[in-house]
Amino acid sequence: MKIWIKRILLSIAALLALSTAVLGFLSSRPGADELRGSVEINKPSADVWAFLEEPEKLKSWVGWMKEIREATPGSRGVGSRQVWVMEDMNNGGALMEINGEVIAYRPGRSKTVRINVPGVFTGETEYSVEDLGGGRSRFSQNSKYAFANSFTKLLTPIIMPSASKKGKEDMQRLKNKVEAQ
């Protein structure tokens, strides 16, 4: 094999190894697998809470949401389960089913949902609504994820900024929907 071909192949291998090392380092940083965000809404907290509890209202502000299936119809507290069917626009519009189970619940204030997509990720998301007085409230969402395989874990520095952007868009949509009613 000609020497220049060997050099090109070695350079490509070195770039791949370096890229993998950088992604590995970035994905292992504290907080790399977490998302946090909040938005102030010029409506009372009860109005915001309805957009977390009522499936049609929830679908109206969570982007990519196509369907919500109640696994425990009528139940909203600890142990209630839903399946969110999402059209993942970062994956060519493929449908993804996210299983969720409420593991902590304070009506009108907060709920924590354990979520999973088998073979892809698991996580927990806390949704909270804080009364700021004067008919204003703050909605917050804090999530932590664990990816199911090494390749996906390696892509954390690419996946999480995209998820963060979507989360911010969703929160702005929530603000607009609640304030418009």
Regions found by a protein language model. Name each.
Residues 5, 9-12, 40, 70-119, ...:
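Glycine-rich portal/gate segments that line the openings of hydrophobic small-molecule binding cavities
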Residues 52, 141-142:
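Short, well-ordered beta-strand segments in beta-rich or mixed alpha/beta enzyme
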Residues 45, 49-55, 62-65, 79, ...:
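Extracytoplasmic/secreted envelope proteins and their assembly/folding machinery
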Residues 4-72:
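Hydrophobic ligand-binding cavity/cleft-lining segments
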Residues 41, 45, 51, 92-96, ...:
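Solvent-exposed, acidic/flexible segments
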Residues 30, 132-134:
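Surface-exposed coil/turn segments at beta-strand junctions on protein surfaces, enriched
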Residues 3-22, 138, 144-181:
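A conserved amphipathic terminal alpha-helix motif
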